Amino acid sequence: MTIPNTIPITPELIASHGLKPDEYQRILDLIGREPTFTELGIFSAMWNEHCSYKSSKKWLRTLPTKGPRVIQGPGENAGVVDIDDGDCVVFKMESHNHPSYIEPYQGAATGVGGILRDVFTMGARPIAAMNALRFGEPDHPKTRHLVSGVVSGVGGYGNSFGVPTVGGEVEFDARYNGNILVNAFAAGIAKSNAIFLSEAKGVGLPVVYLGAKTGRDGVGGATMASAEFDESIEEKRPTVQVGDPFTEKCLLEACLELMQTGAVIAIQDMGAAGLTCSAVEMGAKGDLGILLELDKVPVREERMTAYEMMLSESQERMLMVLQPEKEEEAKAIFVKWGLDFAIVGWTTDDLRFRVMHQGEEVANLPIKDLGDQAPEYDRPWRESGKRAPLPANLVAAPEDYGQALLQLVGSANQSSRRWVYEQYDTLIQGNSLQLPGGDAGVVRVDGHPSKALAFSSDVTPRYVEADPFEGGKQAVAECWRNITATGAEPLAATDNLNFGNPEKPEIMGQFVEAVKGIGEACRALDFPIVSGNVSLYNETNGVAILPTPTIAGVGLLPDWSKMARIGSANDGDKVIMIGVDGSHLGQSVYLRDVLSSSEGPAPEVDLFAERRNGDFVRSVIRNGQATACHDISSGGLAVALAEMAMASGKGLTIDLSEGKGEPHALLFGEDQARYVLTLPADVADFVCVNAEGGGVPFRRLGTVGGTALVVGDLISLPIQQLRDAHESWFPDFMEGRGELAAAE
């Protein structure tokens, strides 16, 4: 077999494709010859970290992925979970970190576009989006530009496409100065018996290209996303894709219409590594070969090479295996929606991935070795050292508790995110019941009288850095807790694991321990991982990001009329804390923002207590007994109470005199498995008796009423003063009002 090879394959070319010398040797051994330039590009795309998960696969296999409601776990475009009545929720989260740092608007926009395609490729109509964003320190010269671009990109794409953004996170830390994180989540609803998968079945079937035309944008994007950054970062701008949400909306409608005709055998969106990855995955999963004819690919640029067509990451494109007799019907649907429809290949029985271009064979490779048999590493890893305990009596108490609380609610990381989410359409589709700013976003299930879904995304990177195992557990527990705080039953989760360079044993150790913690928490809480994404090499000039294993979860509310909000308390309600008194100040935001310290261990997560306390809180909400509920997380009890008071516009009078421990630990400690409930006075005693009977720790805190948050003689702050501090930081920062705002 002779394949013309016009570009010499040099060690420099191999290295620039992200392939190590031993990986290139493996290619030579596999195919018995030197690869063509196109084949080198194909191997580079399929064997990079972004597509093959070669450093993480071993550990991802340890995660719990099955459960009574799980219809489809990891391995497809998105996870699928049963929500009763013949419906299912389809969801996934994935990163677009590297592109968003280089070109923030398009990087973030195409991150949203890619995750929406993952959902509707499965046959689901998207109903909700979230995004978890991490930026560098506020006074870094690039941060404001990146925040502005990313938020505009997320909003520009999601709003135009027509999906409500119902939640997310925005955090700042110097460790993200050279490597921001954009983790995009989407969920959709489908019929449980009409899920579409990517596994091709049958020989001699047409492989069809759908959607927008192919250009040169994003060539090599997946390879870039598997590398560390250095000073040459600006040169990587051409590897960022450009998105068009209106084309994507047409693609959604055309795909869902086509799926109803019975024409679709397999379907895969073109994401990372474009045509290469989608074709290889469809063939390899179905134990079939694929023959592609690139001359039939719709292009929007002239003289595109086979290499460029195979690796382009142009957006809004799909690949499908079709029932041959339905070809004309399918084509008519796509033409109606103004989209390209082209038969670009066939399935074969030879397990080869063959690519033809201008009459020449430019690639002929073993498809299984590109796909599910790509290299896999068991990288050396080192356990993180344990931090010494930090008793509360060794941590300075604030001179003025009220000032300390104002400082926290008005800080870069605890202040209101209204500036961000008001740029997103949170209400489109008309089903949003809870908007950003609470514990979880809640969306009605269209067509059902009482059913709704709750969504949350969580991780506390400073905890993961201090103790990756406990930090991994805590990310899962907080997500589960936020969903529970609405009254929803947490069903399943998706993970987006963002770490530095896995070739460094200490970074690989963070990853391994965090995955172990995530797995333990998911098992204890019956919260399986059904989809996800790993983003490694998040380093610039050798400085790694904080380890950030984001967990996004979905919960089911059978009757949304009984759900809890954080701001729905009534005057005269009693305030009760479920869980233990605050005692843990290690890694707390009080320590970080008030005392400028990062000492101590992360809080331990008692998963038995999480389960017991959460199940109790959920039952109280579902019985219609709670008027409001909020989980206690960063900032401890004081910040949770302040957020509830600001959300409801009603004051709280709190008495901590029976609390055991130091006052600053009671108020700012970040112990886990805790909630604040407000209950009508005549119900509160009954709930407390039930808690006692169930072995659930609780503390009566006080009463709702007035216009101030009053905690004994320690804090007395008018709600308006809290709101002024809470709401002003973000707009002041973005408008550059007094650079002091950025340096807080």
From Swiss-Prot:
EC numbers listed for it are 6.3.5.3
List the keywords (alphabetical). ATP-binding, Cytoplasm, Ligase, Magnesium, Metal-binding, Nucleotide-binding, Purine biosynthesis
Residues annotated as binding Mg(2+) 1 are: E94, N533
MF-aspect GO terms? ATP binding; magnesium ion binding; phosphoribosylformylglycinamidine synthase activity
Q: Which residues of this protein are catalytic? A: H50, H96
InterPro entries given in the database record:
PRibForGlyAmidine_synth_PurL (IPR010074), PurL_linker (IPR041609), PurM-like_C_dom (IPR010918), PurM-like_C_sf (IPR036676), PurM-like_N (IPR016188), PurM-like_N_sf (IPR036921)
Compartment(s) where it occurs, according to its Swiss-Prot or TrEMBL record: Cytoplasm
GO CC annotations, alphabetized? cytoplasm
Pfam families associated with the record: AIRS, AIRS_C, FGAR-AT_linker
Give me the reactions it catalyses: N(2)-formyl-N(1)-(5-phospho-beta-D-ribosyl)glycinamide + L-glutamine + ATP + H2O = 2-formamido-N(1)-(5-O-phospho-beta-D-ribosyl)acetamidine + L-glutamate + ADP + phosphate + H(+)
Broadest EC class assigned to this enzyme: ligase
SUPFAM superfamilies (UniProt xref): PurM C-terminal domain-like, PurM N-terminal domain-like
The residues the record assigns to binding substrate are S95, H96, N97, H98, R117, Q241, E313, S314, Q315, S535
Q: Pathway, per Swiss-Prot/TrEMBL? A: Purine metabolism; IMP biosynthesis via de novo pathway; 5-amino-1-(5-phospho-D-ribosyl)imidazole from N(2)-formyl-N(1)-(5-phospho-D-ribosyl)glycinamide: step 1/2
Q: Which residues cross the membrane?
A: none
Query: What GO terms in the biological process aspect are recorded for it?
Result: 'de novo' IMP biosynthetic process
Q: Please tell me where Mg(2+) 2 binds in this chain.
A: D118, D269
Name the residues that bind ATP. Y53, K92, D495, G532
The UniProt similarity line reads: Belongs to the FGAMS family.
* Subunit and interaction comment: Monomer. Part of the FGAM synthase complex composed of 1 PurL, 1 PurQ and 2 PurS subunits.
The protein's role, per its UniProt record = Part of the phosphoribosylformylglycinamidine synthase complex involved in the purines biosynthetic pathway. Catalyzes the ATP-dependent conversion of formylglycinamide ribonucleotide (FGAR) and glutamine to yield formylglycinamidine ribonucleotide (FGAM) and glutamate. The FGAM synthase complex is composed of three subunits. PurQ produces an ammonia molecule by converting glutamine to glutamate. PurL transfers the ammonia molecule to FGAR to form FGAM in an ATP-dependent manner.
Q: What is this protein called?
A: Phosphoribosylformylglycinamidine synthase subunit PurL
